[in-house]
Amino acid sequence: MQRFSHPARSLAVQPPRALPHAALEAFVVHLVAVLDAQRPPYEALDSSAMPIRDCKRRGHGWLAGRADIGWSNSLGWYEGFSLLTATDPTGVITGFCFAAASTADQQLAETFFATRARPNRRLISVGSAGAGPYIADKGFEGAENYLRWLESFGAHVIHPPKRNSRKKRWSKRLRRWIASIRQIVENAYEKLFNTFGLWRERPHELEGLRARLAARVALHNFCIWLNDQLGRPRLTFADLLGW
């Protein structure tokens, strides 16, 4: 595994203890700055399942007390964590954090916004607050949440109302437009989970999970940086990973 000398390769294959999560998260933050993604016009915000164990298995897993059971539209019930990421319009992951799978999107987002507004050296993975709004789905709905996030953290969240909401309904055209904007974060998750194999990880320690996650995010942003150097579309990863 150590025969690859290219930094993208070595980043992906080094064991977590050789690259502590703090260093990897710092590298992610550095790449965001290098890619000039700190002040995007908007960021797409979304959560996704991060399973670590088959929830139907008996007994307690390695991360009992940290991970728990949650629901995913794509996976159904799963055991693990909920991952939240913010992505700029070109695909750069500008920040991320995770919590137990049962954590509500609104609760996870509040921690994310609060940490961006009042940075904590132990949680640098969330990145820096941007100047534009966050584009989210209806899972982040809530008038009280909206006002609190805006007033307390300066986070302006735009999301479609639920279809049975008493608020003014959005047109299908507007919903499709918001969905098209948010597609970029789905593309980023596809890279993390499938291209880079995050869904196949079965960590035994929380620190190991943080390192594995940070390594995938760093590799994702590094591939974007490399494509910039080569004059290629930012999200064209397939042949890069075929070296």
Where are these regions (language model features)?
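Short alpha-helical elements
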Residues: 1-243
